[in-house]
Amino acid sequence: MPQYRSKTSTHGRNMAGARALWRATGVKDDDFGKPIIAIANSFTQFVPGHVHLKDMGQLVAGAVEAAGGIAKEFNTIAIDDGIAMGHSGMLYSLPSRDLIADSIEYMVNAHCADAIVCISNCDKITPGMLMAALRLNIPVIFVSGGPMEAGKTKLSDQIIKLDLVDAMVMGPDKNVSDEDLAKVERSACPTCGSCSGMFTANSMNCLTEALGLSLPGNGSMLATHADREQLFLEAGERIVDITKRHYEQDDYSVLPRAIACREAFENAMALDIAMGGSTNTILHLLACAQEAELDYTVADMDEMSRRIPQLCKVAPSTPLYHMEDVHRAGGVMAILGELDRAGLLNSDIPTILSPTMKEQLAKYDIMQTDDPKIIDFYRAGPAGIRTVKPFSQSCRWDTVDNDRAAGCVRSLEHAFSTEGGLAVLFGNMAVDGAVVKTAGVDNDNLTFTGPAKIYESQDTAVAAILGGKVVEGDVVVIRYEGPQGGPGMQEMLYPTSYLKSMGLGKKCALVTDGRFSGGTSGLSIGHASPEAAAGGVIGLIEDGDIIDINIPTRTMDLKVSDEILAERRIAMDIHGWKPVSRERHVSTALKVYALMATSADKGAIRDISKLK
């Protein structure tokens, strides 16, 4: 029988001083012996997805204490990728994932907490918290802040739906008037919550449902909707239940590594592919698998991408649907239900809520249940009122979207495509793999051959695109932007957005050892591994070299002979695999990150072999 971890600091004469300090935080005599639940919040006023989380920790704390636990809240950092985008601030985004994981480990282990409730939402916060949870392997539940409502505005006498990416694309587009741009800017992000499309934040929050570590609706219920409050309250109540089951009933099945097992990671990847999630999710799932000590690789993901169909299509891959529409169609449980009926889901594994995923789907998949409470839950919709307050509205759709032939979520027979929304490419340009969000690639661009235009920073690529130096047929290559080379593996949302602004969105390809925002669409291939700074072939490409991309065959090749590449490699070995000329201040903190970072095919995690 495992002992409560908290007894280390709450029991015995030698801990009189520690108990005195616990008392100073509000712990009373009859509290000692109760499980201590750490509430890892991520409130900040910098990030729309987190601006409303200030009181969420105490909401959960109240539920924890009512259920018989001691709740202690702390906060992690949270970076807004959209605000940090397009300048040196983006160097810090991915490294913050590791800092978040470490900060949770530090707080939870230093204070001997027994379990964790992770209150996350945006891009690096959810994966950082997942890494910590799987590293610590103590009872955990995830509850996120929820998605933003989609924006709406009137352009050319039409009401259109909007999101952040629309504002980014229209900004440099000279065909968009100042008046229309102002309308879009003011309408694109109308409420608190994670940006409204299937971008990285929402993708990751959906994946926590597939991993079995969050409650149904966590990934899709709007931040503004009153129904979301119940997710926080239930998380607080349930964490006490599973914590007592582990420590008092010797139940190891409730631990995160038991729930988020290899089969659960396969479910998460199946969901990711089926819903056309962000390519960043591949990076984060690889990192989380490492923390869980699972042998799960890009090769496994590649195999799945060939047999999992795309059953859901959401912005930025289509303007028709946003997260509020995914929720109306039944959310993550609906997509998992369709995968299960197609024989593509491991449904006999546990979740934090049910003994098996199959039992959970029987209750929460709108195509299986006739429970009016569940149907009502998935009718929760947007109010269309600008606000930063959570739970501020209770609007509902008249009906759920259960149209599996032409709705937001499709059945296998009516899939958007027979292959999924993400793919891994291999070839001499990416020996260890590169990733592309096929959900956002036009069918005419599934194969593409063109000359390389080489840029050794995002900044120079942006200047070239906006300056008219990139033309139809080019393959824009942005290198030395990987985990080591950046350092920090910047997102390339602005280059892809500006290609669209210049009318080149379907006429060019972009390849990088950096990564892409979940808001990216088009023929944008990232995570090329090994990265240039690690000696990858992407560092050997020269202007005018022909690059051949073939998504159906999952290949990406540089049409240069092995002999010429060998000669170039000798020259680069002498040069030191660094940009020929690039002015960039790299802080000491980022240099430390770069020293330990692996390439994207390993999840950009730390190379712990360097510690031996």
Curated annotation (Swiss-Prot):
Its cofactor is [2Fe-2S] cluster; Mg(2+). Pathway: Amino-acid biosynthesis; L-isoleucine biosynthesis; L-isoleucine from 2-oxobutanoate: step 3/4; Amino-acid biosynthesis; L-valine biosynthesis; L-valine from pyruvate: step 3/4. The gene is ilvD. Homodimer. Signal peptide: none annotated. One of its GO terms (cellular component) is cytosol. One of its GO terms (molecular function) is 2 iron, 2 sulfur cluster binding. Its EC number is 4.2.1.9. Functions in the biosynthesis of branched-chain amino acids. Catalyzes the dehydration of (2R,3R)-2,3-dihydroxy-3-methylpentanoate (2,3-dihydroxy-3-methylvalerate) into 2-oxo-3-methylpentanoate (2-oxo-3-methylvalerate) and of (2R)-2,3-dihydroxy-3-methylbutanoate (2,3-dihydroxyisovalerate) into 2-oxo-3-methylbutanoate (2-oxoisovalerate), the penultimate precursor to L-isoleucine and L-valine, respectively. The modification N6-carboxylysine is found at K124. InterPro entries: Dihydro-acid_dehy_C, DihydroxyA_deHydtase, DiOHA_6PGluconate_deHydtase_CS, ILV_EDD_C, ILV_EDD_N, IlvD/EDD_N. The active site is at S517 (proton acceptor). This is Dihydroxy-acid dehydratase. Binds 1 [2Fe-2S] cluster per subunit. This cluster acts as a Lewis acid cofactor. GO terms for biological process: isoleucine biosynthetic process; L-valine biosynthetic process. It comes from Psychromonas ingrahamii (strain DSM 17664 / CCUG 51855 / 37). Belongs to the IlvD/Edd family. Mg(2+) binds at D81, D123, K124, E491. Keywords: 2Fe-2S, Amino-acid biosynthesis, Branched-chain amino acid biosynthesis, Iron, Iron-sulfur, Lyase, Magnesium, Metal-binding. [2Fe-2S] cluster binds at C122, C195. It catalyses: (2R)-2,3-dihydroxy-3-methylbutanoate = 3-methyl-2-oxobutanoate + H2O; (2R,3R)-2,3-dihydroxy-3-methylpentanoate = (S)-3-methyl-2-oxopentanoate + H2O.
